[in-house]
Amino acid sequence: MLSFLDNSSDEYLVGATYNKLYYVNPSHTVYDITPSGLTSGNLNGSLNLGYGGGFYGHDNYGSAPTSSGVYAEATTWSLDTWGEYLLACSSKDGKIYEWQLNTGVVAAQVSNAPVSNKGIVVTEERFVFALGAGGNPRKVAWCDQENNTSWTASATNQAGDFELQTTGQIMSGLRMRGRTLILTDNDAHVATYSGAPFVYGFERVGTACGLSSRKGAVAIDEGAFWMGKRGFFTFDGSVAKEINCEVSDYVFDDLNQSQISKVYAVHNSQHSEIWWFYPSGTSNENDRYVALDYKEGHWSTGELDRTAGVDSGVFTNPIWADASGNLYNQETGYTHGSTKPYAESGSISIGNGDSIMKVTQLIPDEKTQGQVEVTFKTRFYPNDTESTHGAFTLTNPTDVRFQGRQVRIKVQGTGNDNWRSGVMRIEASAGGRR
């Protein structure tokens, strides 16, 4: 998905499926702008388990292998703007298309542009980068500056190409301040504009930090964030580094690897968060999310069927989509039906946890008293069964009485209220070690 304004400040929302390209106007009218002759893509990712799949000599002759190193990814699109026009490239079709905002005319192939590409990104300097250009998974090709139909390098233009020194394949490109970040499934590279004669210089800025899916990365003012194959990474302009994540095992142990190409990252600037939608278990579609608050450095997880999205800015609210093609205005209202939203902490202990914590009182910090209830869960040993205390209806202060070496707190809304809770305090003392 992509949202943008034209030169008259009219709002545009563009979305794509594995075989279609759509424009949705502010009145919710949907226009099919799919290019003529588009090669239909793959709805789902799949392993090549047919005859000839996998490694030579691994299985019996004439039988389909039980596993394979060959993966056919679900089709995704690269969408970007060229001035006020739309540029689009399907990872399956590989051609670069331009749509000039005429709802009566579909997107058309850009003349002279390379084909068999895996994606595109428009740089800050107004070059179009074709990623995996011409079917070469490591090649970046670019057009002349301000001219997306001139791709053959000459002494009179700035078109060119470069093959990354990498063992991986290019997955995505992200426009950043003063540079363009190019992520492969193995490492990270930066392209920096230098002018003639080389036009762009390329530098590796990270290894063992490959991108999990073509839509699994997002760039914001603070830097770039992406989901890898077994961790999360960020690039702040100098070097790529892994982000400490307390829920990493929870996410990756349950991620459906056969549909990992559907992982989608969105920025929620209203709350300084990066969300990743991903398919869990045996689900073919994204049904869960993991989110990072990049200012406070904490993580959250949950269940939500969203496949793509755009941040607020062009539109008042973020707009996210589900697998059925429904569009949602996110961050609107706070009714939640029978489901009660909650926040839950990790384990709290005194020092290194040798002493028992005796808790006698809770001092709440609510926006409006009475809109939340609090439950405590305690353990005496890390592998012990948890004991539950509460739920407590909060007063100021709230008397409680329990003990344990490890204590967790759960704050849960009691109704359809716009509740907010700050930093609560507990009155506790250290007991013995037994």
Q: Model-derived features: where do they sit?
A:
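Conserved hydrophobic/aromatic positions in well-ordered beta-strands
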Residues: 22, 87, 97, 129, ...
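Hydrophobic or amphipathic alpha-helical targeting/insertion segments
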Residues: 82-108
